[in-house]
A protein has these predicted regions:
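Soluble, non-membrane globular domain cores that form compact, hydrophobic packing
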Residues: 1-119, 124-269
Length: 269
């Protein structure tokens, strides 16, 4: 109703009702930002370059997707509460994630373990201050996700010569492998459970692929067919928010709070 009201106030009754029926919003981003809908802007989608030469010898694709503004709102709320969600959501400027499962995970038990999964997440922001704050927020929450979390200061020092000017890197060791968090300008890149050398190669490839101009892609087609997708009822498919949080839950993210996020994503608005 708030979306309809905003369009009505800006463009009149016809635009709010008949107009939105003729050109309905295509994403929650447009509903959250009715002015962007009115201007016919499209949401930013970071570019995912060809990572296959780096990962195919060790991993098979497990999941891939965008991290939209509503997804970010829920993640920020899980990580830092209402204040974090309120502060970070307007500064969001796109995001994507990719997860792979180790080819060495052969048995059902090995494949069911989160130790078989590695994940990277690219988060784009409208300003450098928000990017830096989100990187710190993410780092602060790692202790709730992993046991045995320790800063790897030696690895951080060894990376200093390879970082571009202005970039900052945090490295941690965990019970499920290294975590590398890099902030470069308005971008935050997180790699979890990849070996450090591979994480840094992925970081360089993906961050270098991002342009400085406005991105014009509205969506990307899924390149991975998930188990059971052929049998799924399209009418019963959950929104991206619920799917992303369920996926992150399966990977171990925010084990203490993720059920609350799932409940919030699926509850009536």
């Amino acid at each position: 109703l708030s979306f309809e009201q905003d369009v009505w106030m800006d463009q009149g009754q016809a635009a709010a009702f008949a107009g939105t029926m003729d050109r309905p919003p295509t994403s929650t981003w447009e509903i959250i930002n009715p002015r962007e809908y009115e201007r016919k802007h499209v949401p930013s989608v970071p570019l995912l370059p060809d990572i296959h030469p780096l990962v195919d010898k060790l991993y098979k694709p497990y999941d891939i997707g965008q991290v939209g503004q509503l997804d970010l709102h829920i993640l920020a709320e899980l990580f830092g509460g209402d204040n974090a969600a309120r502060d970070f959501t307007p500064a969001w400027d796109g995001g994507l994630y990719w997860a792979g499962q180790r080819l060495s995970a052969k048995t059902p038990a090995e494949q069911a373990s989160t130790k078989s999964l590695a994940l990277f997440y690219l988060s784009a922001w409208k300003n450098t201050a928000s990017a830096q704050a989100f990187a710190q927020l993410y780092a602060n929450e790692l202790g709730r996700k992993y046991s045995g979390l320790k800063p790897d200061l030696a690895a951080q020092r060894s990376a200093a010569p390879g970082l571009t000017s202005g970039a900052e890197e945090l490295v941690f060791t965990t019970n499920e492998g290294p975590v590398v968090i890099t902030t470069r300008g308005k971008l935050v890149f997180v790699a979890e459970s990849f070996e450090i050398d591979l994480a840094r190669k992925l970081r360089a490839l993906i961050l270098d692929a991002q342009g400085a101009g406005e991105l014009k892609m509205a969506e990307v087609a899924p390149s991975v067919e998930l188990p059971g997708a052929q049998d799924a009822d399209p009418q019963a498919m959950q929104p991206l928010t619920a799917g992303l949080i369920r996926f992150l839950s399966n990977c171990g993210v925010m084990k203490a709070a993720v059920e609350a996020g799932i409940t919030g994503a699926l509850s009536p608005r």
